[in-house]
A protein has these predicted regions:
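Structural detector for internal amphipathic alpha-helices that build alpha-solenoid repeat scaffolds
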Residues: 25-33, 52-67, 77, 85-100, ...
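Short, solvent-exposed beta-strand/turn patches at coil↔beta or beta↔helix junctions
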Residues: 43-51
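Bacterial N-terminal signal peptides that target proteins for export
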Residues: 1-10
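Short amphipathic alpha-helical/adjacent loop interface patches that line ligand
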Residues: 5, 61, 72, 94, ...
């Protein structure tokens, strides 16, 4: 009797354990992941209140390269962040995404002319060269 009860108990534990595991997997598991978090979470963090969080999100997206292409609209918005320490890694993320970031070309061209921080303006230029070399104005 005890052995039968143990068998039933072990089957229940196995069944419950696997369903708990399945429920704990993120529904967005097909998204690219960086540092254990899905792309959509990093995109959302570009709008976080803390600039350190926005900075970290931009660098994580940069590290994802072309896989972060769905983040381009949010990255374009983030180019207007009031904090230079956020704008800079956003330009890096667009550079790393490459040609899939073509939608950012007009804003990056504008940044080259209007950005008061020379490092960010230069990074915008490098991003443009990577996205589409013909989009970089001749000097």
């Amino acid at each position: 009797m005890l052995s039968r009860a143990l068998k039933v108990w072990s089957v229940m534990v196995f069944a419950l354990g696997s369903s708990v595991w399945a429920q704990s997997r993120p529904a967005h598991s097909k998204e690219p992941v960086s540092s254990g978090r899905p792309l959509s979470q990093w995109i959302a963090e570009l709008k976080a209140p803390a600039p350190q969080t926005r900075n970290a999100a931009a660098y994580e997206l940069a590290g994802m390269g072309a896989a972060a292409a769905p983040a381009v609209p949010a990255l374009i918005e983030a180019l207007d962040d009031p904090v230079p320490a956020v704008r800079y890694p956003v330009t890096i993320a667009l550079l790393e995404i490459g040609p899939a970031a073509k939608a950012a070309i007009p804003r990056l061209q504008q940044m080259m002319d209007e950005e008061i921080n020379d490092e960010i303006a230069a990074s915008a230029r490098r991003a443009l060269k990577r996205i589409d070399p013909t989009a970089v104005p001749r000097q």
